[in-house]
Amino acid sequence: MKKIIFALFFILAIVSCQTEKQGRTAPWSKEKANEWYKQWGWLRGCNFQPSTAINQLEMWQAESFDPVTVDRELGWAASIGMNCMRVYLHHVAWDVDKEGFKKRMGQYLGIADSHGISTIFVFFDDCWNPTYSAGKQPEPKPGIHNSGWVRDPGDLLFEKPELINLLETYMKDVLTYFKDDKRIVLWDLYNEPGNSAYGDKSMNLVQKAYECAWAVNPSQPVSIGLWNANLKEFNKVQLQNSDVITYHHYRDLATHQQVVDSLKPYGRPMICTEYMARHFNSTFQEIMPMLKAENVGAINWGFVAGKTNTIFKWSEPLPDMEEPPLWFHDILRKDGTPYSQEEVDTIKALCGK
């Protein structure tokens, strides 16, 4: 009898291992997600783009990859207590140089890890410019927020539906390569799906992104962030399929608290992967203490003011102004000095620095 029980246990163990290797068909359980979250403590940081890169392609292409700036600026982030960065990828940078792209991702992870910083990688994005190309990227347009940022895959997917096959290969290649990398906190599969008036056209890629991630079954959780309460079908799919709840919120403390309270019943860890817009009263002094108290990850938009021009407000160009009187995003100037010492003091105090 003992032999039979042992044999049955052994068979079940093999089946379990095979299932694990073959992928999964559902999100993590709440218990697994919450146990995963405990190991990280309170995640806080920013959406990181080195000040020398106008967009994802300039960050990741071989000719413009800038590890010196990355190292310097992540050192500044660590010095004020940040421990997690959200970083955008782009399939074109992978497509033109697959092995080099993954090598540079690894190099970035090594630099971040040397500063005690973990990483959330983002695959797709429905925001800003609809078209893009490999090679030299445009110079910033004065006073215009994110003048060179590019979507991924953008309009090209609707013009060439067969691109979905390349995107699947891209996702699976990157996820497989880094599936057990402990320097990666989470895979953010798609930034703000349905934005740029794409609406339901983005749903197919949302579903494909989850399928690809589940097929690879990385050791890290996957998520797609909530960002628009009116996109009810997207929100339903994202809440049903994400291991960890991620979301964006750029408004004041009262409305942000309402969002957090509305998501608590789902019983999963939460990370706010975009916040902090000074014009809308989404500030470090107001929002960050609440997020810490609620044990919600706090990832603001922007760190060092640079080529992205995100010190300027959305849709309010100021082409004749080098610097607006009130910065929209970002924390430090290019020399590492703060836009607001009060803000940096708040961040450091909350992070125990």
Sequence positions of predicted segments:
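Active-site mouth of glycoside hydrolases
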Residues: 23-242, 248, 253, 266, ...
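Catalytic domains of carbohydrate-active enzymes that cleave complex glycans
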Residues: 349-353
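Bacterial Sec-dependent signal peptides at the C-terminal "C-region" and cleavage site
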Residues: 12-26
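Sec-dependent N-terminal signal peptides
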Residues: 4-13
